[in-house]
A protein has these predicted regions:
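Conserved structural position within tetratricopeptide repeats
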Residues: 13-16, 47-50, 83-84
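Terminal, low-structured helical/coil segments at or just beyond the last alpha-helical repeat
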Residues: 72-103
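Position-specific recognition of the canonical hydrophobic site in helix A of tetratricopeptide repeat
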Residues: 26, 30-33, 67
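Helix-start (N-cap) detector for alpha-helical repeat units in TPR-like alpha-solenoids
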Residues: 22-23, 56-57, 89-90
Length: 103
């Protein structure tokens, strides 16, 4: 888990230097999810989504974080948007189903 904390710290620094670094928000969100900090992960995915271009992986990550939090409606909306952007629905749905079973 220490590596995730280090990654978050490094991306904090990178995002202070370049607040429009979309990939930074995405990766920091992934690390936060791994540390079970799902609300903070959602906030990072929000940041990535609000910056152009539409970043499919941010919608997928946010959908998974919302699923862990029990926000099924939001998870479905993000899944739909990711699919519109070209993501594979079956793969996302499989991840969501696994999360739902673990809740």
């Amino acid at each position: 888990m220490g590596q995730f904390h280090l990654a978050i710290r490094d991306y904090d620094k990178a995002l202070r230097l370049d607040p429009k670094f979309v990939l930074g928000y995405l990766i920091r969100g992934l690390a936060l999810n791994e540390l079970d900090q799902h609300m903070q992960a959602v906030e990072n995915y929000d940041q990535a989504i609000n910056l152009p271009p539409d970043f499919t992986h941010a919608f997928i990550g946010r959908a998974l974080a919302h699923a862990v939090l029990g926000n099924d409606s939001e998870a479905q909306q993000d899944t739909d948007r990711a699919v519109e952007l070209g993501a594979n629905r079956e793969q996302i749905d499989a991840g969501l189903a696994e999360i739902t079973e673990q809740r």
